[in-house]
Regions:
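Domain-level detector for secreted/extracellular nuclease and nuclease-toxin modules, and
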Residues: 5-7, 19-294
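Hydrophobic h-region of N-terminal signal peptides that target proteins for export
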Residues: 12-19
């Protein structure tokens, strides 16, 4: 377990270095105003239930989960255009030319289905204002077009599969990370969805520095890292987070990148799974152990 918080330590050291230079890091909560809410308010008729034990009665009390549980509270003063897709919701940032976050509810049924990936190419998202990122921005850049919501999570619907290839669902990602550790985490999420029936997922880029490398004519900003947080409700509510540097993770395991959701919130300035009752949210976001998921 000694490597579990490896990436958190590295990110924390980055924060110290930036602070010493007198710069403000985008993920430093001390530089942010009170975040604005980007969430749904309508309850879903078939919303799943979770439960928590009442300490006064030792009885299990049922908690109704609202629609949009996966939608986070975003950072203040950050460009955000909400785009609602068949299989996910994304907050697009016109400054970075990447999503702030992408969120989706992954069910066991979503991991299998008739939708095929073959023949689908990455597409410009016509729903955003110009300049629009296109696939040519990534050509010979040294970075993959890294899906945030993976195509493999959208086999349940051909439309959802096609929309997963919109450029607003993509970030510049190190090729070895994309095909290696990040892909392994994506596969793990699908396994969890099959095991527990469904999971709620949020992921996106982390911009640590004041200035960032850019690629392409549209100057897509390259993130320094990526985050992913996952929530399950079946049996007993559990949450887990991952933070991965945007470099090759060859030689490392998923467990080396596990973080609590609280730590991911501290680094990103976001609030995840805020529709949960406060006591449950505090309980599950303050600890993370991948053994609890196996």
């Amino acid at each position: 377990m000694k490597h579990i918080f490896l990436k958190t330590i590295i990110l924390s050291l980055s924060l110290v270095a930036v602070a010493c230079q007198g710069e403000k890091r985008r993920g430093d909560l001390s530089t942010l105003d009170k975040p604005f809410v980007e969430s749904y308010n309508n309850e879903r008729a078939d919303a799943p239930n979770t439960s928590d034990e009442d300490p006064n009665t030792n009885q299990r009390k049922t908690v109704k989960v609202k629609q949009g549980l996966e939608i986070p509270i975003g950072k203040a003063n950050v460009p955000s255009l909400l785009l609602y897709r068949e299989g996910y919701t994304t907050s697009y940032n016109a400054d970075t030319r990447t999503p702030n976050w992408v969120a989706w509810h992954l069910t066991a049924a979503h991991t299998n289905g008739p939708a095929k990936r073959k023949g689908i190419t990455f597409q410009v998202d016509e729903d955003i204002p110009e300049p629009r990122v296109d696939t040519y921005d990534y050509m010979r850049s040294g970075y993959d077009r890294g899906h945030m919501c993976p195509a493999a999570d959208n086999h349940w619907s051909q439309r959802a599969m096609e929309q997963s290839f919109l450029m607003t669902n993509v970030c510049p990602q190190n090729p070895a990370l994309n095909s290696g550790l990040w892909n392994s985490i994506e596969n793990q999420c699908r396994t969890w969805a099959e095991e527990y029936g469904d999971v709620y997922i949020v992921c996106g880029p982390i911009y640590l520095n004041q200035k960032h490398k850019t690629i392409g004519k549209n100057k897509v900003q390259v993130p320094e890292a990526f985050f992913k947080v996952i929530l399950r409700l079946k049996d007993e509510p559990k949450a887990i987070g991952f933070i991965c540097r945007n470099v090759s993770a060859k030689g490392h395991k998923k467990t080396d990148y596990v973080n609590t959701v609280d730590e991911v919130e501290r680094i990103t300035g976001m609030d995840f799974f805020s529709q949960l009752p406060d006591n449950i949210e505090r309980q599950i976001e303050g600890k993370a152990d991948i053994k609890d998921w196996n």
